[in-house]
């Protein structure tokens, strides 16, 4: 069974993330939604983010939600992931993720990265926008 790691801070996990995981679960054997701590961001409490993610994707079969505080490649090794899955909304996303892809390959040869474009209905959603809207009381 192929294990795919979908890593991120998911602050918060939104409908676009959930859609990506649902689609990946149909393609691959096992999906691990890896929720990261980050020394470069100030994400919300890890336990809260994990609980919210578990609730949001509870209906999806063969998906595990696991928190981690290491390099993504080290976590991929730990869970025996063969593939990293990333959602790509824009060319800017691709440029950044392409750099990460090459660094991950250098650190863990054989680790592949697969990009999925978002479903059209979620193509504009980002965690930053969700936090901004929530900050003003929007839903």
Task: Identify what each model region corresponds to.
Residues 1-139:
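Nucleotidyltransferase catalytic core that binds NTPs
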């Amino acid at each position: 069974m192929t294990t795919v790691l979908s890593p991120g801070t998911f602050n918060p996990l939104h409908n676009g993330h959930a859609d990506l995981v649902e689609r990946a679960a149909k393609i691959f054997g096992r999906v691990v939604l890896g929720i990261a701590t980050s020394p470069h961001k100030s994400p919300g409490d890890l336990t809260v983010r994990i609980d919210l993610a578990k609730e949001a994707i509870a209906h999806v079969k063969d998906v595990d939600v696991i928190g981690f505080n290491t390099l993504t490649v080290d976590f991929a090794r730990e869970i025996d992931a063969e593939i990293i899955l990333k959602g790509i909304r824009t060319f800017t996303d691709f440029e950044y993720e392409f750099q990460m892809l090459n660094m991950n390959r250098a650190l863990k040869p054989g680790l592949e990265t697969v990009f999925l474009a978002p479903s059209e209905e979620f193509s504009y959603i980002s965690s930053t926008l969700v936090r901004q809207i929530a900050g003003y009381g929007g839903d």
